[in-house]
Amino acid sequence: MAQKKDYYEILGVPRNATQEEIKRAYRRLAKQYHPDANPGNKEAEEKFKEINEAYEVLSDPEKRRKYDQFGHAAFDPTYGAQGGGFSGGFTGGFADFDFGSFGDIFEDLFEGFDIFGSSRRRKEAPRKGADIQVDLELTLKESVFGCEKEIPIYRTEKCSVCGGSGVRPGATPVRCQKCGGTGQIRSRQATFFGEFTTIKTCDACGGVGTIITDPCRECGGTGTVRRQRRVKINIPAGIDDGQVITLGGEGESGIKGGPNGDLHIRIKIAPHPVFKRVGQDLYVEVPITFVNAALGGEIEIPTLDGKTKIRVEPGTQNGDEVRIKGKGVPYLRGRGRGDLVVKFVIEVPKKLSEKQKELLRKFEELSSEEGYEKRKHFWDRIREAFS
């Protein structure tokens, strides 16, 4: 039997090529050797068939895996056979035999074989398309109150020109010459258990019985195209960093008529210069003067809802907190909102006028330890420690 060319060599790609690289190589070669571009050229026609056969295997992850492991023998049981035996025999006994792969070999060997003497044509079942995951950054305010966003995504979709068939509109696929249109390859093969007749899915046409010789120019015969779409997303109020929104059916196109995959949007919340979120509560540090802290009074503070006024109690200490109910983050289930926690930071002036210094000295003279509880307790402990 003539030695088949390596599928990677046919498409001119390395063995570690990505699916996108394989698709690009196929489109370029299919255009170059297409029968319409080479009328009457038998060599170009054979080359075009080679290209389609190679792409049929390498574009399918499962077929590609088998090809990488077993080569052409993965799809043609008679490939490399000599006189009904096995190519090369067992020259080294069982020393070189990979028993770890025996399960795969056995599965391939008896694919399509029915122990009662009948066979059935296997077709690839519809499969769900792959899911897509993207990150979406929100401001803190957008995450708290919710919003609507529109994001671009790239995904594989069914070709609108050929309807996913891969055939140029107006053209029809031709009958597969390898299987005669049956979609199956029948062969006799010697095995460890005797001689068997096996029926396998045709690797040239993938079991459909036809070959696309006049591919759709929009998708290059793949039946799918890569497009950018803009998807609208409703962001619920109260969503947190790291949470995921799933849009069903917005992922990659389904395979063999299967449903589309899903789109998963992972939320990232940008840091806010003023507020910090902890669960459903918001925290903010508000600087106040030492006069505000000592005398108390009303001050204006920021919230995500706008400015509001709160009261500072006389004698407020640095780090004291006030909790404002219902000014935090909404609960996703609609059970109200968390709180806004205001932490007071007492700011001491670094520059004072002579008049201010004089007044503070008088204030110090009029002060007693009774007005400074922490200071009084500190010195009481010192005296107790050394008495």
Curated annotation (Swiss-Prot):
Gene3D superfamilies: DnaJ domain, Heat shock protein DnaJ, cysteine-rich domain, Urease metallochaperone UreE, N-terminal domain. Its cofactor is Zn(2+). GO terms for molecular function: ATP binding; heat shock protein binding; unfolded protein binding; zinc ion binding. Zn(2+) 2 binds at C176, C179, C202, C205. CXXCXGXG motif repeats lie at residues 159-166, 176-183, 202-209, 216-223. Binds 2 Zn(2+) ions per monomer. Its main location: cytoplasm. InterPro entries: DnaJ, DnaJ_C, DnaJ_domain, DnaJ_domain_CS, HSP40/DnaJ_pept-bd, HSP_DnaJ_Cys-rich_dom, HSP_DnaJ_Cys-rich_dom_sf, J_dom_sf. GO terms for cellular component: cytoplasm. PROSITE patterns: DNAJ_1, DNAJ_2, ZF_CR. Residues 6-71 form the J domain. It is found in: Cytoplasm. Keywords: Chaperone, Cytoplasm, DNA replication, Metal-binding, Repeat, Stress response, Zinc, Zinc-finger. Zn(2+) 1 binds at C159, C162, C216, C219. It comes from the Bacteria. The keyword Repeat applies. GO terms for biological process: chaperone cofactor-dependent protein refolding; DNA replication; protein refolding; response to heat. Pfam families: DnaJ, DnaJ_C, DnaJ_CXXCXGXG. A zinc finger (CR-type) spans 146-228. The J domain is necessary and sufficient to stimulate DnaK ATPase activity. Zinc center 1 plays an important role in the autonomous, DnaK-independent chaperone activity of DnaJ. Zinc center 2 is essential for interaction with DnaK and for DnaJ activity. Homodimer. Participates actively in the response to hyperosmotic and heat shock by preventing the aggregation of stress-denatured proteins and by disaggregating proteins, also in an autonomous, DnaK-independent fashion. Unfolded proteins bind initially to DnaJ; upon interaction with the DnaJ-bound protein, DnaK hydrolyzes its bound ATP, resulting in the formation of a stable complex. GrpE releases ADP from DnaK; ATP binding to DnaK triggers the release of the substrate protein, thus completing the reaction cycle. Belongs to the DnaJ family. This is Chaperone protein DnaJ.
